[in-house]
């Protein structure tokens, strides 16, 4: 099996606080994992490091055999998607649902989606249909229920057809 994500002696500190301490872990294509722990145990920090969203204080992170820091952010975002429920709070509230999903196509930030009209709208519609929320595509994101927002964020996470999907 091919190793997709590999962490070697990864640590993360914030000031004097050690968040993660010498984590070594890897995952291979086709595997499914669950990271369990108490609130504040570092689960979100771990998946954010594994997805390249946060840089470890020490240790190394590799994606598909390459140091994660050597990959362009856009390439990494298209190959490894991190879906976080906290995303629902960071998205621009007035955006239409279809634009929330489309904005993930190239790892662009949601407020600038208007300048990317060539993004694959049909793929976004297909993904909304997959999660049975296609009827909401023109609605402003902030008008949705929390459950609807979560399904929209899942569709958004699949927009780039990532090799790896990390759910937080």
Provide a role label for each language-model segment:
Residues 36-38:
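The feature captures the beta-strand-to-loop junction immediately N-terminal to the Walker
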Residues 51:
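Helix-to-loop junction immediately C-terminal to a conserved catalytic motif
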Residues 165-168:
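Catalytic Walker B motif of ABC-type/P-loop ATPase nucleotide-binding domains
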Residues 115, 140-144, 148:
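Conserved ABC ATPase signature
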Residues 59-69:
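Conserved ABC transporter NBD signature motif
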Residues 5, 19-22, 137:
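Conserved structural motif at the start of ABC-family nucleotide-binding domains
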Residues 117-136, 161:
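Conserved ABC ATPase "signature" region
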